[in-house]
Regions:
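Conserved hydrophobic/aromatic beta-strand scaffold that supports enzyme active sites
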Residues: 12-14, 84, 107-111
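Short helix-capping and hinge/turn segments at secondary-structure transitions, especially at repeat
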Residues: 71, 75-76, 113-117
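A short coil-to-beta-strand element that immediately follows conserved catalytic motifs
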Residues: 75-84
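Non-heme Fe(II)/2-oxoglutarate
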Residues: 1-74
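Catalytic core of non-heme Fe(II) oxygenases with the double-stranded beta-helix
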Residues: 90-123
Length: 123
């Protein structure tokens, strides 16, 4: 089964290694450095004291860079709406949630960098 058919039939798609090692390292380093330097600590539950960023220029460029690859895999044209990233710290828990209902029909989740054990993403 090709990616586009799987996406149409199941409503999700896993695209392994969509970012190269060096680009992934660069984006991950940017996220951690931005969190360390800028802070932008959020108080929103359930993520108190966790750095979060909306419309970060590097992430906006990453979105534009990945768009053709994701459109090709999904077999459809997509309209990017927003970028948002958060740097989780030890002890943080990401509960089941829906990404901004009404603002996005499809979401992309990327693990850019990690320390310690793998933190699974459930669909």
């Amino acid at each position: 089964m090709n990616d586009a058919k799987f996406f149409k039939d199941n409503g999700y798609l896993i695209i392994p290694k969509i970012l190269s090692g060096e680009l992934l390292d660069f984006i991950g380093m940017h996220a951690f450095n931005r969190a360390k330097i800028d802070g932008n600590i959020t108080a929103e539950p359930p993520f108190p004291n966790t750095p979060a960023f909306y419309a970060d220029l590097t992430m906006e460029n990453l979105s534009a860079f990945l768009l053709p690859k994701i459109e090709s895999a999904a077999g459809m044209k997509l309209l990017p709406t927003y970028t948002y990233f958060r740097v989780y710290k030890p002890g943080d828990i990401l509960p089941k949630h829906t990404d901004r209902p009404g603002a996005c029909e499809f979401s992309i989740s990327l693990c850019l960098r990690k320390k310690g054990k793998i933190w699974p993403i459930f669909i």
